Curated annotation (Swiss-Prot):
It is found in: Cell membrane. The lineage of its organism: Eukaryota, Viridiplantae, Streptophyta, Embryophyta, Tracheophyta. It comes from the Eukaryota. This is Auxin transporter-like protein 2. Induction: Transient induction in roots by S.meliloti. Its main location: membrane. It comes from Medicago truncatula (Barrel medic). Residues 1-59, 101-135, 194-196, 254-266, 336-356, 400-425 are cytoplasmic. Pfam families: Aa_trans (PF01490). One of its GO terms (biological process) is amino acid transport. Keywords: Amino-acid transport, Auxin signaling pathway, Cell membrane, Glycoprotein, Membrane, Symport, Transmembrane, Transmembrane helix, Transport. Belongs to the amino acid/polyamine transporter 2 family. Amino acid/auxin permease (AAAP) (TC 2.A.18.1) subfamily. It is a multi-pass membrane protein. One of its GO terms (cellular component) is plasma membrane. PANTHER family: OS05G0424000 PROTEIN-RELATED.
Length: 484
């Protein structure tokens, strides 16, 4: 990647004149230089491939380990069909977000607004296109979702490392990994995740195929049963976890803004989802085939596979990847916080890192309160992802282009596979109604019922969620028995 191309391209100027302004917080303007730089190669990303790696890596994090649990709640057929269904819906709404970003950016650039040293975020797109009420709605849902998305990564870290070293309980591991993940405050923006995104996707690819192959080699457990959906509450809990799986694009706008040519993002999320299918469907299917209903009480797939070097390797790689995903989820929160306290245009990485630290503290605390790995995914999916990722983008697109003049002057016309504005409206309306009723309604009821059951069973601040009880020590003989 040549440094002179590291400036973002202005969207307005016929989509072809390069704007050499960075538009990225905390970075100096690049000097035109044709020499190869290792720093640029590893640190400064903004290509289509960088965006693809970021989307795929962020989408397929710890959910790999909970999807077999969801299959045990849904049954094999429903599990596969819902993955495909929500994968398509998620790709469509990511496309809508990219269209709205381009529309917002093009309107602002026509007004000569300069985005140098400012990262555009989703709530700002909503504000610019639909007004302050939509800004508040987007800010509330997006920030809350990203907050709990970060919480889930911390919980997953503690859950996974426990299967390598159970000398410490999961709560203690949460303390340790909270401190480790706090180091993400030093990563300025999504430009700087190039090498991490690449490594992260490699790690999850290894883990997915480890789960698949290890389950097949293990074979079916003795007396395994596959009863499938037995209760509505379990069915909708599992369905909502899959909705959550393919709703990882709360950071879409930030990833787009980190691209040199953001208008090329349109189909990147779909391409990422197609790759993710090759990881999630085989692994979840194989683990469920091997262990069946036993997964209902084991939300982490690692817990049922035999301990060996291959499993330990997968655990370690997932831990590193969860650190990366924590950074993905937290970085937009860092940006929001910087804007609130007036530090967003600060050049010093150290000053910005110091300013960002307060964001990590509530995440750490919530991970200790709600350590329910698995059930918390479904709750977040139903209550937050349903709005953040599916309902709000679909409704926002419908309202942005409700007038004929807006459709006529749209920066992005309807896609080639759906060239009619009417068809787009119908599909968007279907998504809003479906996700509102099935995802938020039934999914919210089921996931919260299950979540409350976990609280009743294990309590808040559970020291070691779903850990095996310690072996009962044999009772010592009574003192008089020792004197025969």
């Amino acid at each position: 990647m040549l440094p002179q191309k590291q400036g973002e391209e202005a969207i307005v100027s016929s989509f072809n004149e390069t704007d050499q302004q960075e538009g990225v917080v905390g970075r100096e303007e690049e000097v035109e230089d044709h020499s190869f730089s290792v720093k640029n190669f590893l640190w400064h990303g903004g290509s289509v491939w960088d965006a693809w790696f970021s989307c795929a890596s962020n989408q397929v994090a710890q959910v790999l380990l909970t999807l077999p649990y969801s299959f045990s709640q849904l049954g094999m057929l429903s599990g596969i069909l819902l993955q495909v269904f929500y994968g398509i819906l998620g790709s469509w709404t990511a496309y809508l977000i990219s269209v709205l970003y381009v529309e917002y950016r093009s309107r602002k650039e026509k007004e000569n607004v300069n985005f140098k040293n400012h990262v555009i975020q989703w709530f700002e797109v909503l504000d610019g296109l639909l007004g302050p009420y939509w800004k508040a709605l987007g800010l509330a849902f997006n920030c809350t979702f990203l907050l709990f998305g970060s919480v889930i990564q911390l919980i997953a870290c503690a859950s996974n490392i426990y299967y390598i070293n159970d000398n410490l309980d999961k709560r203690t591991w949460t303390y340790i990994f909270g401190a480790c993940c706090a180091t993400t405050v030093f990563i300025p923006s999504f430009h700087n995740y190039r090498i991490w995104s690449f490594l992260g996707l490699g790690m999850t690819t290894y883990t997915a195929w480890y789960l698949t192959i290890a389950s097949i080699v293990h074979g079916q457990a003795e007396n395994v049963t596959h009863t499938g959906p037995k209760k509505l509450v379990l069915y909708f809990t599992g369905a909502t976890n899959i909705l959550y799986t393919f709703g990882g694009h709360a950071v879409t706008v930030e990833i787009m803004h980190a691209m040199w040519k953001p208008q090329k993002f349109k189909y990147i999320y779909l391409m990422a989802t197609l790759y993710v299918f090759t990881l999630t469907i085989p692994s979840a299917t194989a683990v469920y085939w091997a262990f069946g209903d036993e997964l209902l009480n084991h939300s982490n797939a690692f817990s049922l596979l035999p301990k060996n070097g291959w499993r330990d390797g997968a655990v370690i790689l997932m831990l590193i990847h969860q650190f990366i995903t924590f950074g993905f989820a937290c970085t937009p929160l860092y940006f929001v916080w910087e804007k609130v306290i007036g530090m967003h245009d600060t050049r010093s990485i150290c000053l910005r890192a110091l300013a960002r630290l307060p964001v990590v503290i509530p995440i750490w605390f919530l991970a200790i309160i709600f350590p329910f790995f698995g059930p918390i995914n479904s709750a977040v999916g139903a209550l937050l992802v349903s709005f953040t990722v599916y309902i709000i983008p679909s409704a926002a697109h419908m309202l942005t282009y409700r007038k004929a003049s807006a459709r006529k002057n749209a920066a992005e016309k309807p896609p080639f596979f759906m060239p009619s504005w009417t068809a787009m409206y119908i599909f968007n309306a279907f998504i809003v109604i479906w996700v509102l009723v099935v995802g938020f309604g039934f999914g919210g009821w089921a996931s919260m019922t299950n979540f409350i059951r976990q609280i009743d069973t294990f309590g808040l601040f559970a020291k070691c969620y779903q850990c095996k009880p310690p072996p009962v020590m044999a009772a010592a003989p009574p003192p008089h028995a020792l004197h025969h």
